[in-house]
């Protein structure tokens, strides 16, 4: 999809008349007709453009390896996923870890623990630790995006596994990245956060380990997850930066770190779509726009 004047004119026209993304949707449909699917091109597309809602879950499944590139195998692999889900669920029921009234997200957690050999003994069951809470937050958010419980489990499982595998070493460095980019955008706000002692106490776990699950409404969250699933954890930094910039007036009026932490952990749900849009623009500004060709 090389840049050319005719395409740029059409894109500008479509956006002006309210059909932003028409060409991008057509390009994605072409990519989805490939057999086998080109995972790298799908990933680059997802980095560069918003995914249409009608294709989002399918693209996520391919990028996360839930479905293979060969479309001919999708029905068979889907059945394997269903069978495995039912087998693990049945095993947990027999072991009396779950029952009819167990919340679905807790079932996902126990299934995840069983697969990863971290399932505690029934006699040693404890309240969820921080890692469990991160899992449950992501699972609750995914439940709002995906209706089917089998799809939901596999998406949560593979999302978390990929996130840890790809970005585990990068996560501890994201707060420093936030400080750097905030210094580029608003030195005054950064100085206030430092002077108040709030910079070290921002809700980093909510932002960078739960990937904003429980912070942003799902309509905004899924646009952030498009970028994470397709290979960027840096987008999380720019969403955090834009949240701080968007609520600057409120934050500048607070001097207690606890008050700032509480406000950001329970931030207003209005205008989150605009925040995410600005964050993506900021991300492209500093990190560039991946090139993509159909």
Swiss-Prot record:
Residues 50-232 form the Rab-GAP TBC domain. Signal peptide: none annotated. Keywords: Cytoplasm, Cytoplasmic vesicle, GTPase activation, Lysosome, Membrane. GO terms for molecular function: GTPase activator activity; TSC1-TSC2 complex binding. It comes from the Eukaryota. Disulfide bonds: none annotated. Coiled coil: none annotated. It is found in: Lysosome membrane; Cytoplasmic vesicle; Cytoplasm, Cytosol. GO terms for biological process: activation of GTPase activity; cellular response to starvation; negative regulation of TOR signaling; negative regulation of TORC1 signaling; response to growth factor. GO terms for cellular component: cytoplasmic vesicle; cytosol; lysosomal membrane; TSC1-TSC2 complex. This is TBC1 domain family member 7. It comes from Danio rerio. The lineage of its organism: Eukaryota, Metazoa, Chordata, Craniata, Vertebrata.
């Amino acid at each position: 999809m090389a840049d050319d004047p005719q395409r740029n004119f059409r894109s500008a026209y479509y956006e002006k008349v309210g059909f932003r993304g028409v060409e991008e949707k057509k390009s994605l449909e072409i990519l989805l007709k490939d057999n086998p699917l080109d995972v790298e091109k799908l990933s680059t597309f997802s980095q560069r453009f918003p995914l249409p809602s009608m294709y989002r879950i399918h693209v996520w499944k391919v990028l996360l390896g839930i479905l293979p590139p060969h479309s001919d195998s999708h029905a068979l692999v889907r059945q394997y996923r269903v069978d495995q889900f039912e087998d693990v669920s049945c095993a947990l029921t027999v072991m009396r870890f779950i029952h009819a009234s167990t919340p679905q997200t807790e079932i996902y957690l126990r299934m995840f623990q069983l697969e990863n050999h971290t399932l505690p003994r029934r006699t040693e069951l404890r309240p969820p630790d921080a890692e469990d809470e991160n899992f449950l937050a992501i699972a609750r958010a995914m439940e709002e995006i995906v209706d089917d419980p089998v799809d939901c489990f596999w998406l949560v499982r593979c999302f978390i596994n990929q996130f840890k595998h790809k970005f585990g070493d990068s996560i501890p460095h994201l707060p420093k990245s936030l400080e750097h980019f905030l210094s580029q955008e608003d030195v005054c706000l950064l100085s206030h956060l430092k002077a108040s002692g709030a910079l070290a106490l921002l809700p980093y776990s909510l932002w960078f380990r739960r990937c904003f699950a429980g912070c942003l409404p799902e309509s905004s969250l899924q646009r952030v997850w498009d970028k994470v699933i397709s290979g960027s954890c840096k987008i999380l930094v720019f969403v955090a930066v834009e949240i701080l910039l968007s609520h600057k007036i409120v934050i500048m009026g607070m001097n207690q770190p606890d008050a700032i932490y509480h406000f950001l952990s329970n931030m207003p749900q209005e205008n989150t779509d605009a925040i995410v849009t600005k964050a993506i623009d900021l991300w492209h500004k500093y990190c560039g726009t991946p090139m993509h060709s159909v």
